[in-house]
Amino acid sequence: MLKKLSVIALATMALAASATSFAKESLLDRINQKGTITVGTEGTYAPFTYHDESGKLTGYDVEVTRAVADKLGVKVEFKETNWDSMLAGLKAGRFDLVANQVALTTPERQAIFDKSEAYNWSGAVLAAPKTETRIQKIEDVKGLRAAQSLTSNYGELARKYEAVLVPVDGLAQSIKVIETKRADFTFNDSLAILDYIKKNPKSDLKIFWESDDKVGAGLVVDKGNDEALSKISKAIVELRNEGKLKALGEQFFGRDVSVK
């Protein structure tokens, strides 16, 4: 579920970062002066950032950001934009931060941006019908049929454990072929599976295995704003300790996703 960024865009932003002036106003000063945090987000990436039936912008990332703003004592203004230009917009100063399931795992991104304390974690899971009795551990998938995109990391995981791949285009098709018994299980992102189960309570799908190797998403700011980042991370830790992140996880995914 976590976002990708082109090498070209990263290179462009790296050049911009090298030209940043030391006299630049700090992010914390700017936020305090405005009394508002300006946030870049897609608004079309459910269940993280989307519009509900009433048209209100909501989602896990959106509500976490609102809670962080409350902790900081400022208002929040969301600016919806497409993903391809979002981090470039952050670098250009259109936003104070980005809330859009960004993991910031690559060295290229880490050289340009900083990420707060993680507010959710995700990793690979194995999902199959509740009635499945052959799978007790991941090694048990050997010889079973896995509904996977052939070129995905999850497809590679299925090959590693010697499953028979049933080609699909995405999660929706994976679930369909499992329901029609043309496949036995699928490897996929934990948040994607939890979102599906939450939205489809009558589904027969169940998580049988979950990877210990997880990636955390956080709020992203331009490089060099350590003071603001520290306050944002402190707010996220407080929200976790107070149970707010757990409550939001249960609201959007059916369980707490704020811990590994």
Question: Each predicted region: which residue ranges?
Answer:
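Short helix-initiation/N-cap motifs at beta->coil->alpha
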Residues: 62, 78-88, 133, 151-152, ...
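Periplasmic-binding protein-like
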Residues: 120-125, 190, 194-237, 255-260
